[in-house]
Amino acid sequence: MEVTADQPRWVSHHHPAVLNGQHPDTHHPGLGHSYMDPAQYPLPEEVDVLFNIDGQGNHVPSYYGNSVRATVQRYPPTHHGSQVCRPPLLHGSLPWLDGGKALGSHHTASPWNLSPFSKTSIHHGSPGPLSVYPPASSSSLSAGHSSPHLFTFPPTPPKDVSPDPSLSTPGSAGSGRQDEKECIKYQVPLPDSMKLESAHPRGSMATLGGAAASAHHPITTYPPYVPEYSSGLFPPSSLLGGSPTGFGCKSRPKARSSTGRECVNCGATSTPLWRRDGTGHYLCNACGLYHKMNGQNRPLIKPKRRLSAARRAGTSCANCQTTTTTLWRRNANGDPVCNACGLYYKLHNINRPLTMKKEGIQTRNRKMSSKSKKCKKVHDALEDFPKSSSFNPAALSRHMSSLSHISPFSHSSHMLTTPTPMHPPSSLSFGPHHPSSMVTAMG
């Protein structure tokens, strides 16, 4: 069949108004936009010529099979240019579209017939010949392009609107049922999905959130972090700052008192630890330890406290006859000697010569141990810290530098860093960045 003069009206770039469904006479009374009247569909011969003509009008060999031609007879071209496979957009004012049943085989290219398992993109990347509508197995859109939900349901037309019998032919009834079965086969029923959500509400929401994020952004994202504290690993009291019952150590009272218990030796009724003697009687901790170490009962009368070595009246050194010393010692004979003579005899095994006697007592400043010195400096620094007038980073760095020999984090006043994602999605917008991404020690 030769190309007539009226056939270029089916070419997409000559009459975009007709192909886009904008002509006032081509609207179907029962459908939305982008639907043409079936009476204006092209004949099979015209479609054959349409697909066998290249851009310059030359006749080329047939590229598509009979199944594609049969499909084109039921679908009018709806777009101009190379993107002729884009489905028509349904009007937003159709209140009867709900997620109950599938539309039908003649609306296979509608964006409502979605399948979450489809991998076919709606835009072709190759500049070669393009099909008007792909087959039924690849006609559904990807779920990530249209909706972030995992389960989608096609809309249901109202009962009073019946499909036009002219849109479907008797020969295409079998293929229409097959397409409808394929659309329903990949849809998950609602009760199963609700069972999954009701079983684990937090886990299902986290799974849906992760699926939506991976569908919208092709770049790999991190899974959402939803801590599950209801598993019983950590008791609820640990979340509120209290000490867990199974992990914290209870502070024992210093004195245990129980009714009916009394030390048989001293009569005490409260003690840190109750002990027993050989006969099974209760003893307080002091009497029990004394009996264990000495083998006898602890004496109830306290011995008189000895006077300090410097205040012993009438005591003099047997070697140098001094009466003042910091510590009284005894020589081999048992006589009292001063501290200087006693140390000298202990070191040299001879009596200290009298020429070394001095009027005053020589004392030396003992150096503090490194541990006690560090503890003292930390205590002084903590006392001076609240006295600072302002809590700015400069003052904080000065205080941290004073603790440089103590704290392992003293080389910098910033100790905590904020985590940053390795691969941020390209479509996400972030707020203005601060000059420093560190968190100071003040929080």
Curated annotation (Swiss-Prot):
GO biological process entries: anatomical structure formation involved in morphogenesis; aortic valve morphogenesis; canonical Wnt signaling pathway; cardiac right ventricle morphogenesis; cell fate commitment; cell fate determination; ear development; embryonic organ development
MF (Gene Ontology): cis-regulatory region sequence-specific DNA binding; DNA-binding transcription factor activity; DNA-binding transcription factor activity, RNA polymerase II-specific; DNA-binding transcription repressor activity, RNA polymerase II-specific; E-box binding; RNA polymerase II cis-regulatory region sequence-specific DNA binding; transcription cis-regulatory region binding; zinc ion binding
SMART domains, sorted: ZnF_GATA (SM00401)
Keyword Kinase: no
Modified residues (Phosphoserine): S115, S162
Presence of keyword Zinc-finger: yes
Region (Flexible linker): 288-316
Residue stretches of biased makeup (Low complexity): 129-149, 414-429
GO cellular component: chromatin; nucleus
Zn finger (GATA-type) start-end: 263-287, 317-341
Region named Interaction with TBX21: 1-258
Motif, YxKxHxxxRP: chain positions: 344-353
Subunit structure as annotated in this protein's UniProt entry: Interacts with the phosphorylated form of TBX21.
Description of its domains: Binds DNA via the 2 GATA-type zinc fingers. Each zinc finger may bind either adjacent sites in a palindromic motif, or a different DNA molecule allowing looping and long-range gene regulation.
Name the UniProt record assigns to this protein: Trans-acting T-cell-specific transcription factor GATA-3
UniProt organism field: Bos taurus
Gene field: GATA3
